[in-house]
Amino acid sequence: MMVLEGASALSPFRRARLETRLQTLVPALRLTGAWHVYFIRADAGRTPDQATLQRILQAEPAPAPRDEAASSRYVVPRLGTLSPWSSKATELMRGAGQPIQRVERGTRIDLAGWPEGEADQAAVAKLLHDPMTQSLLGSAAAAEALFNVPDPGQLERIPLDALEQANGDLGLALAQDEIDYLRERFAALGRDPADVELMMFAQANSEHCRHKIFNASWTIDGKPQERSLFRMIKHTHQQTPQHTLSAYSDNAAVVEGVPAARFRPDPATGEYRSEAVVPSAFAIKVETHNHPTAIAPFPGAATGAGGEIRDEGATGRGGKPKAGLTGFSVSHLRIPTLPQPWEAPRALNPRMAPALDIMLDGPLGGAAFNNEFGRPNLLGYFRSFELAEGQGLTRAYDKPIMLAGGLGAIDRNQVEKLRLQPGDAVIVLGGPAMLIGLGGGAASSVAAGDSAEALDFASVQRENPEMERRCQEVIDHCVALGTDNPIRWFHDVGAGGLSNAIPELLHDSGVGGVIDLARVPSDDPSLSPLELWCNESQERYVLGVPQARLDEFAAICARERCPFAAVGVATAEERLVVGYGVFDAANRESGIGNRNSALPAAEAASAHSLFPTPDSPLPINLPMDVLFGKAPKMHRDAVHPAAPQWPVLQTGALDLQEAGLRVLAHPTVASKSFLVTIGDRSVGGLTAREQMIGPWQLPLADCAITLAGFETFDGEAMSIGERTPLALLNAAASARMAVGEAITNLCAAPVQTLDSIKLSANWMAAAGHAGEDALLYDAVRAVGMELCPALELSIPVGKDSLSMQAQWQVGNGESGIGNGETPAPSASAIPDSRLPIPGETLKSVSPVSLIISAFAPVSDVRTQLTPLLQREDESELWLIGLGGGKQRLGGSVLAQVYADDSALPAFGGETPDLDDPQRLRQFFELIRDAREGGLLLAYHDRSDGGAFAALCEMAFASRQGLDITLDAWGDDAFRSLFNEELGAVVQIANEDRAAFADLVERHALTECAQRIARPTGTPRVRVSGQGRVLAEWRWEALFDAWWSVTHAMQKLRDNPDSADEERAVARNFQAPGLRPKLVFDPSEDVAAPFVATGARPKVAILREQGVNGQIEMAYNFERAGFRAFDVHMSDLIEGRVDLAQFAGFAACGGFSYGDVLGAGRGWATSILERAALRDAFAAFFARSDTFALGVCNGCQMLSQLKDIIPGAEHWPRFLRNRSEQFEARTALLEVVESPSILLRGMAGSRIPVAVAHGEGRAEFDTAVDQAAARVALRFIDGDGAVASQYPLNPNGSPDGITGLTSTDGRATILMPHPERTPRSVNLSWHPAGWGEDSPWLRMFRNARVWCG
């Protein structure tokens, strides 16, 4: 084994942060350093070139510890597994000609003062590594165990009389009637079950997978109910089936879209083309991933996003994920640097991550997966809620809600799956099996705390988004074949792993199957049959393909370097047989064999006829109806709880000034910027409305909007509605308000009719907790039987998660909060009434929670509305409220921020509600008609924080003050400002007042509408009523309260200096924001004369595995008059394509090789370390008639090729952003005078651009290089000065440098993404006078002009 040491693994501030956390455990412990370490095993009998390895890894031979007093610990991938990093890095090194069997990366951590006590050592070890995916070693030599091949685990038989014990030992979460069912079925089979059969049954029949409660029969308060919960949900679709193409029968629902043309490469030639405009469709799906996020926030949220993405991809015969949404509900954050008066200390569950850790790490996990996969995340919500309900019981989200959803494109001819036929191949597409996520379906179906801690961690999956991107590229290619798509039917692999996905695949087609476990790709040879069959390793799909097309399918996968295995065959007999070495004699001897060798003949009809007589009993040999047959049906007997006892908030003693600041500072109301800027929102080039709005880029949009294609202004919109705290007082009202809020949010988009809106309903509850079952039934009935039918709304898709409670027993010394970033308060800080008693059982129970996501096709996206106030001197703000004159405060944020330390805070009273559904219909039609009539300048819905929060957010977004007048609102200023009834604030020009008032009257909403405020240019917000000023705030004071959570969270999570700089920029009332300036006319098509000749030069749209920005890049070149071709690096390596045939190439953005060697370095290494490929690129660059463009990941890659690019010798490398965070921003660029052929005639322009990268900070070898480099683009502020302040300069590059060119201008590299905004409508904000073409399209037209 060779050991090399690389660069420091921690930046100074992250090192200091880790040391602080270590010292909270062991005060004398010192962190003296942390370095990347590489462990390399060569092929037997061969020696790799060490100099080459050092060059590729940027590493040196490992020295001795740098501090003699230090004790070194090595964090390495879990022994016995192969990390995703290793598989990619090993592939790179082999491609570079190195005889490497495997390379792994670890981290050497040097510590002084290593503790002697076992408890302290265990606590430190837990902080240093994740035991699910990592091992902690005491020496580098011990890492030799990484390369050991352990013996596989064995199959176990479980005696029928031991099923109850196995239920607990294996964490099966089976009910007694299910155990009795299994005992009866296996007794009839005459044998004991195998452990793998029990685990498979438990996963396939878990509450998570089979939704037993939603399908149960019900008795409420002694009265039998006619309908199940699911039947009431289906009632909405039965009443309003129009516009829905698929409901309840697939991985996602499919709804009608607008006519559009797909733009994609021809699968035969690789040339990109716009297909004919046809009626389109889109898939919609929203999942939750609550249990894994509670246990391990980053991977839990990441795999939640990944699983939902796979659902969209596996819809019909193949969909294309397009835009995502994310949401979180947690308990109080308790930020150490931002204590809040409503956050009373209490004991927390030591087996679950606290809310602060969840919100520091979970959003990063979800964002990272979306970013690397290449799906923009355009929508979200965040709620923090916690309320005491008596000794030992808290109503809170200790078990969080982690929402992951989105919409995806799907061709109409791919919506219906085709049944598998006997003889069809059963394929596993994607990554290898590993011992992760074992039993996740069952684990997420029980209350947190009811299972063993080891089982909790075993149930959490781990993510590899770059692998999922490769799978999606395979799916896209198959779909592009149209009706000739080789995929008949497929599922994503989620809960239960292959043990759930493959039986579902077969059962849905009415067939059985024989599966060879020896063919299942695995990176862990120690896996037992149970572990191999049931683990939930991510980024996998199962699909059926005719055997006659296996070679074709294999070629598609090989081009994308996407692993797949033909693991079995469908049979006519409906029996599932699973064993080892089923199809190949060699497999029976070695346990491995060729995973894609020939399968049995298609005419096979019997499972037994395919299986040779085994030497030992089969792991699985069951009739399919054991899994999918008549398992016991659940019955729920529920009773309504007593009326809530929380007192009513008395507003008479409150201070209005203080109340406004508190409400804005509550995390549910406060700025979500820290959750938004970590996620890419522009990838794909079809975004028309993201969260950020206006020149000052604040995250205040009410909904998200995407374009249906590159050449239409129609598209799709989505929004979220949720008002979960209200359920503690009125569950039905909470559900109605969730639906209402989703609609009022969606009104900002040009949706034409209510019946075109389709809802996803995500239901959460603590099933079994006293009264909660009845409240859940009330909520479902209110929506499914009453509200949605009345409004012609349907719910074709959804999800339930009904174990939303956590319980634990207090041990000695557990007196307060203590986990992760959150310090433990002393016992004296907790009121006596809240002090837990050792041995006491504590419980946290969430409210009944409905999260509604609304989706709809939209017409002209240019007519969308945002909260950005137009700077009209003569305008006013109107409130349209749907509360029928009521101003109910029960459950409001105002009540929450005045929750005191008493046992029952003043949270109660009557809640907001949608008393009259038709009033919401009238509101929807009013806003639609007013928008189409050009009467609305701005729009913002009223929600948490009431009209006061909505008004302040509009003022923040627009850098304006407000004069608010309450005279027409009633006598109680608190009720007027802070009630959270449904409604919206709109801006109307004075000249349109009469026309708007007339429209309001025509829609019978005159009693609901009132003029409430005027925008001003003064930095203050003033509230007046009854002839006097009731309160007045400085604009900055209100903004600081609203920004406080983002600032505090960024300081904990990111570079604290960057957080301080952003706050200074954001709170500056006088800041100019984005202030574009153009020196050319974007509507002038300078390439038109050249295009008119009919000549269309060929350009290669170059991508490597993990690249995700090729489609929008190709569109820009095609639009400018080129023939754009999809060229994978494997095409060049294997000689299918020659770079010499192209006039230019564009290296696209993404995460090539998952950036395992640093951003773009893996891609560059694959070129530089292959002599033939290096020569081909060098020859291309040397030609005087070629050009090259590198964007983002392509920029990083080309910067590593500077030695073979003439005139690029002074280019920098690109390192981690100064904020140490992925940055997704709209920034202002200045086009600098340079030789770049792409930027001719643009110098001096200042143009907004999408930025999305984690490693964009330019670093030059020397000051001479920086001075000599040909800078083409730089970040500037709104006044045109070079930007040095974050986030105006989002990556911290010197002098704002973010684009460079070669001395002759033929090679240009840039970190921002101009290719994502070919049309003005793609920009987050642009001046009103800009036409259809974005200024950035000029770059590509310039390239066409240069080609002649």
From Swiss-Prot:
Enzyme Commission number: 6.3.5.3
4Fe-4S listed as a keyword: no
Domain of life assignment: Bacteria
Domain Glutamine amidotransferase type-1, first and last residues per copy: 1099-1348
Location of the protein in the cell: Cytoplasm
Family matches, as CDD domains: GATase1_FGAR_AT, PurL_repeat1, PurL_repeat2
Protein name: Phosphoribosylformylglycinamidine synthase
Organism: Xanthomonas campestris pv. campestris (strain ATCC 33913 / DSM 3586 / NCPPB 528 / LMG 568 / P 25)
